[in-house]
Amino acid sequence: MGEEDIGEAVPKEQRQGWGQFLKQIATFSGDLSSLTAPSFILSPVSLVEFPAYWGEHPDEFAKISTGKDEIERMNLVLKWFIGTLKGQFTARNTSMGSEKKPLNPILGELFLGKWPDKNDRGETTLTAEQVSHHPPVTAYHIENRKAGVTLEGHCAQKTSFSGRTIQVKQVGHAILRVKLAGSDKEELYLITLPNLLIEGLWYGAPYVELTGNSYIQSTTCLLTTLSYTGKGYFSGKAHSFKATIGAGGNALYTVEGEWAGVSKYKGKSVSGGSNELFWDASTQREEVSVEAVEQQGEMESRKVWKTVAHGIRSGDFETASKDKARIENAQRQKRKDEAAAGTPHQLERFVHLDNDQEYSQLAAMFKGQPATEDGYRSKPRVH
């Protein structure tokens, strides 16, 4: 593959800049998230919006608490989780042509939304906050109070370059709480995050592949192990996975397929059938409902980035770059002023835990690593 092949999916007028960006990546030491990407590869969406992907199948989220026993509930948790992956990792290729670099949220940036009650499923609400800027960390809280299902977590990324691929280690976890109908009991599920590979850089058409393993561990001692593989040079299908639900080292159910396509039970299913459909990723996703920008607070994401996002969408990259620089310079000055006054930034919607005990207890059940991790919990709010 020669130099002439670099960025063949990139507009001709942008190819020189793309080639320079690739060289910058290859020689950069440290976390790539701090690099400034060429304008045409920027997304008009802030990273603080990404937790919304967890909620884009609100029916599946609400159904989790309807399982008749812990085994059925774990199957429902896995189904909801697999259902979130297409939105999280491939849907932007359809909507924007290829994976784009999201806007790096400012400290304290908020994203608030909801999925309305339909068919008596209950309303699902979302609160996300950028709780750290160096390194960038987003905390989120998703809740369907009627269904008794709540998800809380945080996510950060550590990125590096290898060959022609960006490797992304997702840092963080989520805790899913399920209140059991007719009792005061609740089940917890620790959800760890898969690592990512961003491929297709050479051609200027990046896409995401999942790699390695992730886990879902419940307080009922059930463990789901997910293994991800992608398309190799000679074999394999893109976006493939295998999930095994087990207890005490014994496999109970196995699901295989493509997380961006169709997956099926391998052998028996939870309903007693054989090789049944598990999930079809063409199932319609529901976008989160958000207040109009004019009604949003000054720290809400789409208000913060309104001019930048409009510039990116309209191809006016000069305006987008200028306003992005204005925002970032104002943030740097704000941090300096806070340091000088001895008044550090305070989280608005979340509390930071130096050691998330629920994570530690659940991770110990499957010898998960790291053994300890910090966490975030939503502050109680007065309505």
From Swiss-Prot:
Biased composition (Basic and acidic residues): 317-339
Disordered: annotated span: 317-346
InterPro entries to which the protein is assigned, alphabetical: OSBP_sf (IPR037239), Oxysterol-bd (IPR000648), Oxysterol-bd_CS (IPR018494)
One Pfam family it belongs to: Oxysterol_BP
Keywords: Lipid transport, Lipid-binding, Transport
GO molecular function, one term: oxysterol binding
GO cellular component: cytosol; membrane
Keyword Transport carried by entry: yes
Keyword hit for Transport: yes
GO BP annotations, alphabetical order: lipid transport
Function: Lipid transporter involved in lipid countertransport between the Golgi complex and membranes of the endoplasmic reticulum: specifically exchanges sterol with phosphatidylinositol 4-phosphate (PI4P), delivering sterol to the Golgi in exchange for PI4P, which is degraded by the SAC1 phosphatase in the endoplasmic reticulum.
Family affiliation: Belongs to the OSBP family.
Name of the protein in its database record: Protein KES1
Gene source species: Mycosarcoma maydis
